[in-house]
Amino acid sequence: MFEDSNAATDHFRSDLYSNSQIAERALNAVIVRADICRSFEEFLAIFDRFYAENIEATSDTGGEPVRGKDRVRSILLNFLIPLHVMAEIGGLSVGIREHAMPGDAAGETHSAWTLELAGTSGNTCTLSWRTFRKWNGADVIHEHHYDHKQIGGPLTSDDLSLSAVIPADGLRRA
């Protein structure tokens, strides 16, 4: 009887492990395929689909945990909207790559990310970090970013092609 119980528990753990790995691959694939130049809303739809209402987000850069989908969405928007505007209007080239990292705990996944930003000036900034996610079924319930690195300095307005944008004082009234 005890052996049957262990077999059932092992099967359950195996399912949890494989299900979280499948969900992780699906989430990461849609993030990589999404195009910030086209829309930031695509990323919000991904967030809404894969993250639990009670999501908790943390980072090794300090600060208190951010709890709740609305609060995390607000932080996400503060990142996505400027990035979208710089890509759509300023000509910023944005590329993102993901690399799965091995793990052995059911319901937990790790991945490494690289965000490459290239201005029209030719200057680049590459950000990399690692992500730990804890899953409950198909929903992320905890996400932690760690091991942040930056190669290259921050890009400035000189690195973007903003000359096509008409300044507000350059508009004439009819």
Regions found by a protein language model. Give the residues of each.
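A solvent-exposed, acidic/Ser-Thr-rich amphipathic alpha-helical stretch
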Residues: 42-109
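A beta-strand edge to alpha-helix "cap/lid" segment located at domain peripheries
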Residues: 1-18, 80-174
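Low-complexity, intrinsically disordered short peptide segments enriched in small/polar/basic residues
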Residues: 27-29, 52, 63, 69, ...
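Short, low-complexity N-terminal intrinsically disordered segments enriched in polar/charged residues
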Residues: 1-49, 53, 170-174
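Hydrophobic alpha-helical core bundles mediating ligand binding, dimerization, or RNAP-core interactions
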Residues: 27-34, 40, 51, 75-80, ...
